[in-house]
């Protein structure tokens, strides 16, 4: 699956990384002779990329391997590229995926950040406005909040207590948004403690760094 996904990116067939063999079959139908199905991916998001050419090790793309894990192995502080989370189009790209919008679904996507109650209220208001204009709307939520939304499509990333599951489901859910032909997507933010930065990095790219902050 990893080799096929690399081939997929070279051919520029799709924007979202495949996380199941069925995704590879869909994207590369007729272009490859065989798919070896090892089941869904165990992690979901791509690897951590680290720059060791500067005075301090720097994470250029966050992944499942966190800066804390790297610090324990390297025996020194590992810093994080400030352009990972903040939108900064002036920075010269140093790692794959930093320049191009690789993770975007077809529909416009917005991340809503804030307290749980404020996020639910704002997303429902935004959904209602879109539906009034005849749009089909998806909400990316969690198991804890999914029943609070009134969108046409509600997709759960899993429980906030299981950030590994959130990472596993991310690309599958973005793909489902395309398959369901939604017109707009609103997503909760996912500031989880361990790999939350990697998850948010991918979501921010998918949303083109479009974020609504609410209290």
Regions found by a protein language model. Give the residues of each.
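A C-terminal functional module that forms or caps the active site or interfaces directly
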Residues: 91-208
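Glycine-rich, Lys/Arg-enriched anion-binding loops that position phosphate/diphosphate groups
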Residues: 31-124
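Charged helix-capping and loop-helix junction motifs
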Residues: 18-23
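Conserved PLP-enzyme active-site core in the AAT-like
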Residues: 26
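Single conserved hydrophobic/aromatic residue that forms the stacking wall/gate
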Residues: 1-13
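Short, flexible loop segments at boundaries between secondary-structure elements
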Residues: 211-215
């Amino acid at each position: 699956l990893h080799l096929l996904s690399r081939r997929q990116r070279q051919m520029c067939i799709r924007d979202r990384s495949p996380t199941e063999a069925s995704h590879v079959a869909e994207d590369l139908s007729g272009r490859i002779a065989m798919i070896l199905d090892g089941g869904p991916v165990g992690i979901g998001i791509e690897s951590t990329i680290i720059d060791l050419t500067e005075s301090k090790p720097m994470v250029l793309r966050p992944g499942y391997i966190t800066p804390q894990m790297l610090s324990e192995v390297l025996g020194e502080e590992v810093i994080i590229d400030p352009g990972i989370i903040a939108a900064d189009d002036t920075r010269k790209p140093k790692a794959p995926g930093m320049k191009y919008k690789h993770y975007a679904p077809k529909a416009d996507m917005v991340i809503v950040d804030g307290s749980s109650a404020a996020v639910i209220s704002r997303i429902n208001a935004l959904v209602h406005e879109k539906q009034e204009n005849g749009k089909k709307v998806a909400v990316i939520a969690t198991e804890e909040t999914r029943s609070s939304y009134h969108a046409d499509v509600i997709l759960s990333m899993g429980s906030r207590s299981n950030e590994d599951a959130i990472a596993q489901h991310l690309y599958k859910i973005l793909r489902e948004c395309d398959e369901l032909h939604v017109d707009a997507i609103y997503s909760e933010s996912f500031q989880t403690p361990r790999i939350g930065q990697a998850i948010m990095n991918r979501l921010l790219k998918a949303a083109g760094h479009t974020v609504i902050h609410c209290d």
